[in-house]
Amino acid sequence: MPDYFICDLSHTSQRISSEYIPYAIGCIKSYYHEHGKHDVNIHLIKYPEDLSPEFFKHKPSIVAFSNYMWNTDLGYGFAKAIKEYSPQTLIVFGSRNYPLETVRQIKWFEEHPCVDLYIIGEGEEPFKRV
């Protein structure tokens, strides 16, 4: 059974910004298990220190990141490392933190070449289609 990761990484250097799994990625996992067509193990990752060991343990075919202004660099740093090690892994970013204008969207992908797909807004239905 393939593994997918959905990450909403939280900075932990000073203190944990939230002790709970973010609601949005929990909803995506729940929706996928109810409506998805494939048997998949979906892992929710919150803490950056958990992502690397879990990645090497499970070798997921998809790694998705919630992309907010406070964790863009954190998520992209991991996305870049994952692509260097495993170019076949699909990297998905998602949230409303994405330009609306086509020209700026193209520029965003040029500045973030490790991202294969961006889901704008609610992610439940689009992630199911990935």
Task: Show which residues each predicted segment covers.
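Extreme N-terminal starter segment of soluble prokaryotic enzymes
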Residues: 1-5
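Short loop/turn segments at strand-loop or loop-helix junctions that form parts
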Residues: 7-11
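N-terminal cofactor/phosphate-binding cores enriched in small/glycine residues
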Residues: 25, 31-32
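Zn2+-dependent metallopeptidase catalytic core
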Residues: 35
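Glycine-rich beta-alpha loop elements in corrinoid/cobalamin-binding modules
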Residues: 31, 39-130
